Amino acid sequence: MTDASTTSRPLFNRQQLISLFLPLVAEQALSISIGLADTLMVSSVGEAAVSGVSLVDSFNVLMIQLLSALATGGAVVASQYIGHREPKRAKASAAQIMFIMISLSVVTAVIVAVGRHAILRGIFGSIDADVMRYAETYFLLSALSYPFIGVYNAGAALFRAQGNSKISMLSSLVMNVVNIGGNAILIYGFGLGVMGAATASLVSRMIACFTVMFLLQKPDCALRIDHLTDLKPDLDLIKRILKVGIPAGIENGMFQIGKLSVSSLTSTLGTAAIAANAVAGNISSFLNVPASAVGIGALTVVGQCLGAGEKVQAKRYSRLLLLTAYAGDWLMNLSGLFFLNKLALSWFNLSPDAYGMALELMVWFNAVSLILWPSSFTLPNILRAAGDAAFTMTVSVISMWVFRVAFCYLMVLRFHCGLLFIWMGMFLDWAMRSLFFCVRFVRGRWMEQKVI
C-alpha cells in the first residue's frame, strides 16, 4: 500500500465529487417526498387501512434499515478493493454481498409470509379485526418484496462504491413513479385499497431490482457478476463484509426500535401533540437531505482513499465532506428558521395548538441541527468507511437508550413534561454522539482499522 505519510495525485477531483453527490441529494429528497405522497394516497382508503399499513411499515422500515446496513458493509469492502486496485477481489466482494442479501431476504420473506399473523400479534398485541385484516394483507405483499429490496440495495450500494450515484437515483425515480402511478390506478381506479397499495409497492421494487441487476451486468461495469457460480459463499469475504455490516445492522435496528419506543410516549400526550410531532418530523426530514447525502457518498470517497493506502487524502476529504455537510445543513435550516417552517406548516390542516407546537419544535430543530446533526450522522459514515463500525454501533446504541429513551421516559412519565422534552431527548442523544465521534475522528483511531 502507499505510505500513509505520502500522497499521490488526488483520487477525486471536484467534478467527480459533484457528480457523486448531486444525484445522492436528489435521490434522498425524492425518497422522502414520494413517501409522503404514498401515505396521503393510502389515507383515502380509511382509518383502519391507514392503521394497518402504519403498523406494518414500522416493521418494514426496520427490515429496510437492516438490509441497507448489510449493503453498506459490502460497499465499504468493494470501495477499499477498488482503491487498492484489486478488481478481482472487488468483483468477488460484489458477488458475496449479493449472496448475503439474497439469502437473508429470502429466508426473512418466507418467515414473515408464513408467520405474519403471529408476528403482528407478538409485536402489537390485540388490535381491531379490520386493522389486523388490512395489516396481514399488506404484510404478506411486503414480505414478498424483501428479496427485491435486498438485491436493489446491494446493487445501488455497489454502483455508489464505484463512484456512480446516478444509477441509484434513476432507479429510485423509476421505482417511486411506478409506485405512485400504481397506487393511483389500483386504489382510485380499481378500488383495491390496501392490496392495491401493497401490489404497487411490490411491482415498483421488482422493476427497480431488475433495472439495477441489468445495469450491473453490463460489460463496462467493474463489479459485474459474470457467472452464477460467483455467488457461491466465500467465507473470508463474507467475514470482511459482516465485520462492517453486522455492527451497522445492529446500530440501525436498535436505533429504529428506540425511536419506536419513544414515539409511543407521544401518543399519551394528546391528538394535537401526535399531529405536531408527525408533521414536524416529516418536514425536518427534508432539512437534512444534503448532509445525509454527503454521509452516503463518504462511504465511497473515504473507502477508496483508505483502500489505496492514502490516509492523508482520506482525512483531507473527510474534513471537506464534513464541511460540505455543515454548509448544506446551515443553508437548509437557516431557510427553515426564517421562512420555510411557516410555509411548510401551512400545507397541513393543523389545529392552532398543533401548529404552535410544531412550529416550536421546528425552531428548536433548526437551531440544534446547525451545530450537531452532521457530526452526529454524517461523521459516523466516515468512520464506517474505514471499517470502524463497531465503535459507531457501541456509541449509537448506548447514546440512544441512555440519553434519548431513558431521558424521554423520565421527563414524560415522571415529571409530566410535554412534547418538546421528547425532542430535547433527541437533541441530547445527538450531543453525546457528536462528542464521541468527534473525539474518535480527531485522535485518528478510526484509520487504524483493517478491512482488506
Per-range role (PLM):
Residues E47-S58, A135, F139, A198, ...:
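Small-residue hotspots at the loop-to-helix junctions and early N-terminal turns
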